[in-house]
Amino acid sequence: KTGVTAALSLLSGFLITNLLIKNAVARPRPFDTYTQIIPLIIRPKDYSFPSGHTCASFAVALVCLRMLPGKWGILPVVLAGMIAFSRLYLGVHYPGDVLAGFLVALLTSTVACRLMRRTFSPQKS
């Protein structure tokens, strides 16, 4: 159940972030705007806003936080936070991009968890 919920959150986050918002906003990446920034990875070719990596990692991590016990729910959130920070450190996102990616993930994980809870909850007669 957790895996299906995480996959639903991840897929919906990808669709919202990469297919809708990125193309609608079309925000250049920091290294495109500020030439003194040298990215530490191969230059991504898509737009900056919102961060797809942050959205993807938190889309799964927040589902884990809600559905898994104890450290098994917290560890993915810590790892997602590290991924979010890395996007800033690598010079490929602005802080607002990372925040927006997190907010999309918060939305998709919440909707996915509620949908799965309704789908798999015992029916009252």
What are these model-derived regions, one by one?
Residues 3, 16-17, 56, 60:
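Amphipathic alpha-helical interface surfaces
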Residues 25-40:
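Membrane-interface interhelical connector segments
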